[in-house]
């Protein structure tokens, strides 16, 4: 006969399921938490190890569970929960009168008497992975174990353990109790992921709202509030016209037949000030391309004459109305255009005037190509041909030829005369610098001396 574990919480959920199925134990419908399978294991498999009377035997090991203990929603610890956390912290000796003294109460009282291995087993039972228990860390782990037992007793006393049965109530159990006792949290995260799959349904439900918002934004994009000035004339007033600012919304001129506009400015008629927020009912009669806005006054406007300003506007207007140009401005613009045209003609006198300012001449046909016969007229320049191109800068060869012509303009006899004068001057200088007696001018010099 195989021996089953006394503490099946050490096993994982999948291992518990496989053990229960292997021993012909019916599992509850649906996905349950781990503690439900632990209770099934204790009820059906652990009870097969020995008869229920052996469960009350004295032993220092961890407490043995029996079928009777599982069916009763009694807490693991006999102190703290019923009397209160204060008494449990002071002595932890108070117990319920209805509870029977069991080994669990002794363990609660004798936490300090447990060995290191037993203390380690108790901590592992509550889902804690302790380190090595030494003399310095033993007190810390003892406090931790007491705290875990207090939490376990409070949770069990407040909500009893569910009894496992094959009825439909097992499908409603969620096992929210004693979640800290078991370290198998991987399966819980999987369940959360399954619940998160419902988010696309919310997104589908919100799609009509976004479509409505887009439609309203699309309709608002066509709207443009334009401020138009309308002139009001009163019957008894002698002053100038009254200018009232009215806002016209072109959006939905066909959809909304009537609007109510409130003017928020002060207007003066014969010294009388019209208070703010004066209602003006605008009746819009929509037609195919234009709509008529009839403004009707109430209250203070009874003395005014009949007023029906009519404004024509299209269903969708994107451009703001432009101010009419005066005659002076029109004349200035025409003068500027004329001046610009005159300047262009001065810059390009031989260019033909075109609306775009770009002129092009036709290409002359290529003679002799594609088997065409050559003619002598092709090599002669036609007299009627005139080039419209006016070169701005002359080539450098022409400049050099002009310079050479200017140099040749000096007559030749002037050059010869200048050459003779220079030669005589140089000869005289040369003769004056000689000191020998063979001077040809010595006779002339001597005759001048004798005459003196």
From Swiss-Prot:
Residues 5-48 form the LEM-like domain. May help direct the assembly of the nuclear lamina and thereby help maintain the structural organization of the nuclear envelope. Possible receptor for attachment of lamin filaments to the inner nuclear membrane. May be involved in the control of initiation of DNA replication through its interaction with NAKAP95. Residues 1-409 are annotated as: Nucleoplasmic. It comes from the Eukaryota. It is found in: Nucleus inner membrane; Chromosome. Keywords: Acetylation, Chromosome, Citrullination, DNA-binding, Isopeptide bond, Membrane, Methylation, Nucleus, Phosphoprotein, Signal-anchor, Transmembrane, Transmembrane helix, Ubl conjugation. GO terms for molecular function: DNA binding. The modification Phosphoserine is found at residues 59, 66-67, 79, 82, 155, 158, 165, 167, 176, 179, 183, 189, 221, 223, 249, 253, 264, 291, 305-306, 314, 361, 377, 384, 401. The modification Omega-N-methylarginine is found at residues 85, 87. There is a cross-link at residue 400 (Glycyl lysine isopeptide (Lys-Gly) (interchain with G-Cter in SUMO2)). Interacts with LMNB1, LMNB2, BANF1, AKAP8L, GMCL and chromosomes. Residues 109-153 form the LEM domain. The chain crosses the membrane at residues 410-430. Mitosis-specific phosphorylation specifically abolishes its binding to lamin B and chromosomes. Residues 298-370 are annotated as: Binds lamins B. Residues 226-240 have a biased composition (Low complexity). This is Lamina-associated polypeptide 2, isoforms beta/delta/epsilon/gamma. The modification N6-acetyllysine is found at residues 206, 388. GO terms for cellular component: chromatin; nuclear envelope; nuclear inner membrane; nucleus. PROSITE patterns: LEM, LEM_LIKE. It comes from Mus musculus. It is a single-pass type II membrane protein. The modification Phosphothreonine is found at residues 74, 153, 159, 163, 210, 311.
């Amino acid at each position: 006969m195989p021996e089953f574990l006394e503490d099946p919480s050490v096993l994982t959920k999948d291992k518990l399921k496989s053990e229960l199925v292997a021993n012909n134990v019916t599992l509850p419908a649906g996905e349950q938490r781990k503690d439900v399978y632990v209770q099934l294991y204790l009820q059906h498999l652990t009870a097969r190890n020995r008869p229920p009377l052996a469960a009350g035997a004295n032993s220092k090991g961890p407490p043995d569970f029996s079928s009777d203990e599982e069916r009763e929603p009694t807490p693991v610890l006999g102190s703290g929960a019923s009397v209160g956390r204060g008494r449990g912290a002071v002595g932890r000796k108070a117990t319920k009168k209805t509870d029977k003294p069991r080994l669990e109460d002794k363990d609660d009282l004798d936490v300090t008497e447990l060995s290191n291995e037993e203390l380690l087993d108790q901590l592992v039972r509550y889902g804690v992975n302790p380190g090595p228990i030494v003399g310095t860390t033993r007190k810390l782990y003892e406090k931790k174990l007491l705290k875990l037992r207090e939490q376990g007793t409070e949770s069990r006393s407040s909500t009893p353990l569910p009894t496992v049965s094959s009825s439909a109530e097992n499908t409603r159990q969620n096992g929210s109790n004693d979640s800290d006792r078991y370290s198998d949290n991987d399966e819980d995260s999987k369940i959360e992921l399954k619940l998160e799959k419902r988010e696309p349904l919310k997104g589908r439900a919100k799609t009509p709202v976004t479509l409505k918002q887009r439609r309203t934004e699309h309709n608002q994009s066509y709207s443009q509030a334009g401020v138009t000035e309308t002139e009001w004339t009163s019957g008894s007033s002698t002053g100038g016209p009254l200018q009232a600012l009215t806002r016209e919304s072109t959006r939905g001129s066909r959809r909304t037949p009537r609007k109510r506009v409130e003017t928020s400015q002060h207007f003066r008629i014969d010294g009388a000030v019209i208070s703010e927020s004066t209602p003006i009912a605008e009746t819009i009669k929509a037609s195919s391309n234009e709509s008529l806005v009839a403004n009707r006054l109430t209250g203070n406007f009874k003395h005014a004459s009949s007023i029906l300003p009519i404004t024509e506007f299209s269903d969708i207007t994107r451009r703001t109305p432009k101010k009419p140009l005066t005659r002076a401005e029109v004349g200035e613009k025409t003068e500027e255009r004329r001046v610009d045209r005159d300047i262009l003609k001065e810059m390009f006198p031989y260019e033909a005037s075109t609306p775009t300012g770009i002129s092009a001449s036709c290409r002359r046909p290529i003679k002799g190509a594609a088997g065409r016969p050559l003619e002598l007229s092709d090599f002669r320049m036609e007299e009627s041909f005139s080039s419209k191109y006016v070169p701005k800068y002359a080539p450098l060869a022409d400049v050099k030829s002009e310079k050479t012509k200017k140099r040749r303009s000096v007559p030749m006899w002037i050059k010869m005369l200048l050459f003779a004068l220079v030669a005589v001057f140089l000869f005289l200088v040369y003769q004056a610098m000689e000191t020998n007696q063979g001077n040809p001018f010595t006779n002339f010099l001597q005759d001048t001396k004798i005459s003196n």
